[in-house]
UniProtKB/Swiss-Prot annotation:
Gene: TENT5D
GO biological process: mRNA stabilization
Similarity comment: Belongs to the TENT family.
InterPro entries per the UniProt record, alphabetical: TET5
UniProt tissue specificity: restricted to testis.
EC number: 2.7.7.19
Keyword tags: Nucleotidyltransferase, Transferase
Protein name, UniProt field: Terminal nucleotidyltransferase 5D
Source organism (scientific name): Homo sapiens
EC class (word): transferase
């Protein structure tokens, strides 16, 4: 029996989709640049028309990832941060990449406040002022670009232009995409009204393959995937985020292999400690703004998974990344003004160099942060002097 990848949205899901597309999202400018108030349905429509006008072939526009999952199962407590939009386009060469970037930056001018003088605002100026992240990938398997628009609360509007992408999901619960073109056409009709008797047919697809199976995983908050060896390094960070938000492995007998794959891939893609730190900090910034204790729980969960399932590192590399995660977690506690209780912390002390010639060493305490032992998957909660835990 073949898998069914598609389904039509119900009336309630279409209403949720309409609310998401009609919500005003602020795009914050750097420095003295003003904040733009943008509705997703407007910018998606304008960008699509601009690309077509510039000769770019646009197959469709879709909502992707956590926002699509939210629309399908918002009643299950599913939430989202970023609003990910995928434009299916043809990008045969570098020239088309440049056309896409310039078209998007030009569209942003339309959303500036009316009193702003736009004549001297070049694409480069708009990029520096409003783009948080600009990515271009073109290799044997993947050909896509990403323009992420800045939002200080972490609710970034991410526009992704995909010509080819070997893998478009990490886990079944984030494999959903919702085709937006019927809604865009509906919005273009000024006389159309969204009613239960008359609403557009909107299709959702699971890139995982079996839509109903993926939907069951989403409804029951289960972690499952296919071909884990294809998951890139960021999959480890997403996996730990799912754990922190109440998701559980669908199959406990397979989860250790999955964790080992993800840990190995993370350290292959980010081999140096500086890269690892940058990647983790970026993930925290994008997904945990204003969520201090959740951020702390996330770091402790990441610590547990790395500690239990990393098999590809030398001993000193392993200690290095675990120490980094621990220090990041303690920094979060410091920002929350929560002081750790050290009564149950095991400390190991290094004897001073001038005792090296002695056969027996006395124990001295030196002012260095001691190693801290954490249990995997069960984040520690230090009890502070202010009563918080």
């Amino acid at each position: 029996m073949s898998e069914i990848r598609f389904t039509n949205l119900t009336w309630d899901q279409v209403i949720t989709l309409d609310q998401v597309l009609d919500e005003v999202i602020p795009i914050h400018g750097k420095g003295n640049f003003p904040t733009m108030e943008v509705k997703p349905k407007d910018i998606i429509h304008v960008v699509k028309d601009q690309l077509i006008g510039q000769g770019i072939i646009v197959k469709d526009a879709r909502l992707n990832g956590s926002v699509a999952s939210y629309i399908l199962a918002s009643h299950n407590g599913i939430s989202y941060k970023d609003l990910d939009v995928i434009f299916g386009v043809e990008l045969p060469g570098n020239e088309e990449f440049q056309v896409v970037k310039d078209a998007v930056l030009d569209c942003l001018l339309d959303f500036l406040p009316k009193d702003v003088k736009k004549e001297k605002l070049s694409p480069d100026i708009m990029k520096d002022a409003y783009v948080q992240k600009l990515v271009k990938v073109c290799n044997g398997h993947d050909c896509w670009s990403l323009i992420s628009l800045s939002n200080n609360t972490g609710k970034n509007l991410e526009l992704k232009f995909v010509s080819s992408l070997r893998r478009q999901f990490e886990f079944s619960v984030d494999s959903f995409q919702i085709v937006l073109d019927p809604m865009l056409d509906f919005y273009s009709d000024k006389n159309a009204k969204l009613t239960k008797e008359s609403y557009p047919v909107v299709v959702a697809e699971s890139m995982y393959g079996d839509f109903q199976e993926a939907m069951t995983h989403l409804q029951h908050k289960l972690i499952c995937t296919r071909k884990p060896e294809e998951i890139r390094g960021g999959g480890l960070l997403k996996y730990c985020s799912l754990l922190v938000h109440g998701f559980k492995p669908a199959c406990m007998s397979e989860i250790k292999n999955l964790e080992r794959y993800m840990c190995s891939r993370f350290f292959i893609d980010f081999p140096h400690i500086e890269e690892q730190q940058k990647k983790i900090e970026s993930y925290l910034h994008n997904h945990f703004i204003g969520e201090g204790m959740t951020k702390y729980d996330y770091l402790m969960t990441l610590h547990g998974v790395v500690n239990e399932s990393t098999v590809c590192l030398m001993s000193y590399e392993r200690r290095q990344i675990l120490h980094l995660i621990t220090m990041m977690a303690l920094k979060v506690l410091g920002e929350l003004n929560i002081l750790p209780n050290t009564q149950k912390v095991t400390c190991f002390y290094q004897p001073a160099p001038y005792f090296a010639a002695e056969a027996r060493y006395p124990i001295y305490v030196i002012p260095e942060p001691p190693p801290v032992s954490f249990q995997p998957y069960h984040p520690l909660h230090f009890r502070g002097s202010n009563g918080m835990s």
